């Protein structure tokens, strides 16, 4: 018997747990609770219900009902008995392959009811016995799903490192495509927006990992990651004019601020960009389980990209004009630009006496000179290390 995936995705569950446990998202707690209880009730997620009732961050929101829990446990055990029977039948009537398939189906059921402890244990047993690469890959996907549900990103990263060589060795097209979604989300969570954008944008047109997250969230994460990492030309082709993006963003009211933010930056509507960036910060960054840790960095980097885009067209620009373009005060622009200049995040200088921003973009010769100096320093360090090694050898003789 094969276990059907539940209709509620893994990241929908983990996002609801995040919203329920965050003290800053009290306005979303009731909706999160409704989402969780709908999934728990419809799919008999007894392990998840037990976890929520025992977790200090969520227990206060749970009106614990032992009878409800016991009724779900009973249904789980009845279902597990069917899987055990299938394993026994395979052992008596079939070969090792059929036994492993039956074990994998039981592991999939543990994954679907969010039973991490028993699910991981059975996945490990199946992985060790499996000889086919495809079976090993599927088992690792199940373990990654369980780690995602409980937001254990350290384990997700470890499992992905274990999974990638197996995919390269014997993964078919469908499994390779699934990996893009699984890995793209992880890379975004560790602030590797460039890597995340490459994978998520690439898998949008062939996305099939609905067990992990809904399609519109893949598009949303792809747009967010791409907006901060792609150059202007790629933003146009891969986001602004993308058929997949155009099929999702305009159709979802919740994504209107994200769509407006990307378009206003591309169209050089900087005051509109600043307004919509504030909305994106509130509605897409601070309230997201993966992006909340990076929202300050993200907003700051997007402002820097906007400043760089405007200054690229000028050798000099008055601070008054720049402030008017962004719809903010002169003092704000002065302070914000100054925060980027010391680290060379913006190639400009501010003349406060005359109220002018001068760009100082390095030309190609300067760039080549800096590269030669850098390579020379590396070579000099290597020669010094080599000399020290030779001298130590001479002293020993």
From Swiss-Prot:
Pfam families in the cross-refs: PCI, RPN7, RPN7_PSMD6_C
Functional note: Component of the 19S cap proteasome complex which acts as a regulatory subunit of the 26S proteasome, involved in the ATP-dependent degradation of ubiquitinated proteins.
Organism: Schizosaccharomyces pombe (strain 972 / ATCC 24843) (Fission yeast)
Compartment(s) where it occurs, according to its Swiss-Prot or TrEMBL record: Cytoplasm; Nucleus
SUPFAM superfamilies noted in UniProt: Winged helix' DNA-binding domain
Protein name: 26S proteasome regulatory subunit rpn7
Any one of the GO BP annotations: proteasome-mediated ubiquitin-dependent protein catabolic process
Residues in PCI domain copies: 192-364
Subunit architecture: The 26S proteasome is composed of a core protease, known as the 20S proteasome, capped at one or both ends by the 19S regulatory complex (RC). The RC is composed of at least 18 different subunits in two subcomplexes, the base and the lid, which form the portions proximal and distal to the 20S proteolytic core, respectively. Component of the lid subcomplex of the 19S RC.
Main location: cytoplasm
UniProt keyword annotation of DNA damage present: no
Nucleotide-binding found in the keyword field: no
Cellular component GO terms held in the UniProt record: cytosol; nucleus; proteasome regulatory particle; proteasome regulatory particle, lid subcomplex
UniProt KW keywords: Cytoplasm, Nucleus, Proteasome
